[in-house]
């Protein structure tokens, strides 16, 4: 058996091929797992659990079917879907996790997270993140009419795209000191995260020992998952 990790699907109605690929994954590989962990940015945007978008209902039903089959499903918020709430989690059978979680997997201590908190060189983004994660601001936003939230979200995505176009790739990647600090805080030798869309397995030193950082790929033209078994930790890409 294996535990599976995915992230950064950025599901939206404009990308039906990715949605179809995810549905096949849920009906196939996911059903064989010990557990499924979704490490954020499952959706391209999330403006509230009350959004009647048919895609959201379709995904809730598909994930719930996996959960009902006996495979526990877990979710860590990403920077795109940080407002995903308890209602959708209940409808999809997912358990919401904190932004950093340590798992005991087949004899390994593994830290999992979305990964955006590791990009500490991107000062502008971290300031924005701190602002939009204020509970009072989220409560205020979610109280707005749905059409207003849609307009605000569209404007924020446009601003983010414009800002990122002028940033260096290095700034938008993780900071190595932040990586080591997180791994040493949690006393782990394995870290799995997404966010950067730069799939790779990196070797480093943490806790004065060899350590590994496994980065999930985004689901653009193919699927990406990390498969953890008693024998191995594999970063796997597969066609939709």
UniProtKB/Swiss-Prot annotation:
Gene Ontology process terms (BP): lipid A biosynthetic process
Disulfide bonds: none
Cofactor(s) recorded in Swiss-Prot or TrEMBL: Mn(2+)
Record-listed substrate binding positions: 79-80, 122, 160, 164, 167, 195
Cofactor remark: Binds 2 Mn(2+) ions per subunit in a binuclear metal center.
Residues that coordinate or bind Mn(2+) 2: 41, 79, 114, 195
Keywords of this entry: Cell inner membrane, Cell membrane, Hydrolase, Lipid A biosynthesis, Lipid biosynthesis, Lipid metabolism, Manganese, Membrane, Metal-binding
Metabolic or biological pathway: Glycolipid biosynthesis; lipid IV(A) biosynthesis; lipid IV(A) from (3R)-3-hydroxytetradecanoyl-[acyl-carrier-protein] and UDP-N-acetyl-alpha-D-glucosamine: step 4/6
Topology relative to the membrane: Peripheral membrane protein
One of the record's GO cellular component terms: cytoplasm
Superkingdom of the organism of origin: Bacteria
Catalysis performed (reactions): UDP-2-N,3-O-bis[(3R)-3-hydroxytetradecanoyl]-alpha-D-glucosamine + H2O = 2-N,3-O-bis[(3R)-3-hydroxytetradecanoyl]-alpha-D-glucosaminyl 1-phosphate + UMP + 2 H(+)
E.C. no: 3.6.1.54
GO molecular function, one term: UDP-2,3-diacylglucosamine hydrolase activity
Gene3D superfamilies (alphabetical): 3.60.21.10
Binding site for Mn(2+) 1: 8, 10, 41, 197
Subcellular location per the Swiss-Prot or TrEMBL entry: Cell inner membrane
PANTHER family: UDP-2,3-DIACYLGLUCOSAMINE HYDROLASE, UDP-2,3-DIACYLGLUCOSAMINE HYDROLASE-RELATED
The family this protein is said to belong to: Belongs to the LpxH family.
Protein function: Hydrolyzes the pyrophosphate bond of UDP-2,3-diacylglucosamine to yield 2,3-diacylglucosamine 1-phosphate (lipid X) and UMP by catalyzing the attack of water at the alpha-P atom. Involved in the biosynthesis of lipid A, a phosphorylated glycolipid that anchors the lipopolysaccharide to the outer membrane of the cell.
Name of the protein described by the UniProt record: UDP-2,3-diacylglucosamine hydrolase
Organism of derivation: Escherichia fergusonii (strain ATCC 35469 / DSM 13698 / CCUG 18766 / IAM 14443 / JCM 21226 / LMG 7866 / NBRC 102419 / NCTC 12128 / CDC 0568-73)
């Amino acid at each position: 058996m294996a535990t599976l990790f995915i992230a950064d699907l950025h599901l939206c109605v404009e990308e039906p091929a990715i949605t179809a690929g995810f549905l096949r994954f849920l009906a196939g590989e996911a059903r064989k797992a010990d557990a499924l962990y979704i490490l954020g940015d499952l959706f391209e945007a999330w403006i509230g659990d009350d959004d009647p978008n048919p895609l959201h209902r379709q995904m809730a039903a598909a994930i719930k079917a996996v959960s009902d089959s006996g495979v526990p499903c877990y979710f860590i918020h990403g920077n795109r879907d940080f407002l995903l709430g308890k209602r959708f989690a209940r409808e999809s059978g997912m358990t919401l996790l904190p932004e950093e979680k340590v798992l005991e997997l087949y004899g390994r201590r593994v830290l999992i997270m979305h990964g955006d908190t590791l990009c500490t060189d991107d000062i502008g983004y971290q300031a924005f993140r701190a602002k939009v994660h204020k509970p009072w601001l989220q409560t205020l936003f979610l109280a707005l009419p749905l059409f207003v939230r849609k307009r605000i979200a569209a404007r924020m995505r446009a601003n983010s795209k414009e800002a990122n176009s002028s940033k260096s790739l290095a700034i938008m990647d993780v900071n190595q000191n932040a990586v080591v600090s997180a791994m040493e805080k949690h006393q782990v030798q394995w870290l799995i995260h997404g966010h950067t869309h730069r799939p790779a397995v990196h070797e480093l030193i943490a806790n004065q020992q060899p350590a590994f950082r496994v980065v999930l790929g985004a689901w653009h033209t193919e699927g990406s998952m990390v498969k953890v078994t008693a024998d191995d930790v594999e970063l796997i890409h597969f066609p939709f």
